[in-house]
Swiss-Prot record:
Was identified as a high-confidence drug target. Induction: Positively regulated by the stringent response. Disruption phenotype: Proteolysis of PbpB (PBP3, FtsI) upon oxidative stress in depletion experiments; degradation is prevented by overexpression of Wag31 but not the 46-Asn--Asp-48 deletion. Phosphorylated by PknA. Phosphorylation enhances polar localization, which in turn heightens polar peptidoglycan biosynthesis. It comes from Mycobacterium tuberculosis (strain ATCC 25618 / H37Rv). It comes from the Bacteria. Residues 233-260 are annotated as: Disordered. This is Cell wall synthesis protein Wag31. The keyword tRNA processing does not apply. Residues 31-64, 161-196 form a coiled coil.
């Protein structure tokens, strides 16, 4: 069945399943428009050639009489995607040999021109399709390369940020530990100093307490001795003898001076 521009214009493609690769719709539409225009041009050229051949056949028929066979006057078939080359039309024995050769050359030239145009259009179509596929592959490759580079760069940045955060965390922990050690050492030093001062003060207080105890013992001993001496003196004087208060006061003062 011949391919017409209307067939190209009305063709519809189904979308590929999800996850399958497909061509860009705009590029496909542009290519189909180009094919439609080229096919229209080829059909018009083919029609012009057939009209020209009909005119030549009429001229041959008018010049050579009725001896021209129907094959010589038959127009070439309508344009098809892959037409075959028909054999040159046969001429009757009464046709002029030069006119017959001329008609055969015209038919052959028309067919060759149609074949050449068809092959050229097909070659250009194949080339454009190959270029589109190559361009799509290149774009896809560049996109994959860019995606891989972006992922690698993001991974490197994440690793760098993680390493930096870990380094800062370790530095802060180290500084906190050093500060804690310094505070503990300072607290231990102050504790040692305070305990040393307390021990010194306790030793001084214990020494003074011992002095007070010694003084108390001496004071008690002297007081006892003094009282015993006074009692003994009173016993010797007798109960009738008056007590000399001045003597007692002087003796007590002497006791206190001896104590001091």
């Amino acid at each position: 069945m011949p391919l017409t521009p209307a067939d190209v214009h009305n063709v519809a493609f189904s979308k590929p399943p999800i996850g399958k690769r497909g061509y860009n719709e705009d590029e496909v539409d542009a290519f189909l428009d180009l094919v439609e225009n080229e096919l229209t041009r080829l059909i018009e050229e083919n029609s012009d050639l057939r009209q020209r051949i009909n005119e030549l056949d009429q001229e041959l028929a008018a010049g050579g009489g009725a001896g021209v066979t129907p094959q010589a006057t038959q127009a070439i078939p309508a344009y098809e995607p892959e037409p075959g080359k028909p054999a040159p039309a046969a001429v009757s024995a009464g046709m002029n040999e030069e006119q017959a050769l001329k008609a055969a050359r015209v038919l052959s030239l028309a067919q060759d021109t149609a074949d050449r145009l068809t092959n050229t259009a097909k070659a250009e179509s194949d080339k454009m399709l190959a270029d589109a596929r190559a361009n799509a592959e290149q774009i896809l490759g560049e996109a994959r390369h860019t995606a891989d580079a972006t992922v690698a760069e993001a991974r490197q940045r994440a690793d760098a940020m993680l390493a930096d955060a870990q380094s800062r965390s370790e530095a802060q922990l180290r500084q906190a530990q050093e500060k804690a050690d310094a505070l503990q050492a300072d607290a231990e030093r102050k504790h040692s100093e305070i305990m040393g001062t307390i021990n010194q003060q306790r030793a001084v207080l214990e020494g003074r307490l011992e002095q007070l105890r010694t003084f108390e013992r001496e004071y008690r001993t002297r007081l006892k001795t003094y009282l015993e001496s006074q009692l003994e003196e009173l016993g010797q004087r007798g109960s009738a003898a008056p007590v000399d208060s001045n003597a007692d006061a002087g003796g007590f003062d002497q006791f206190n001076r001896g104590k001091n």
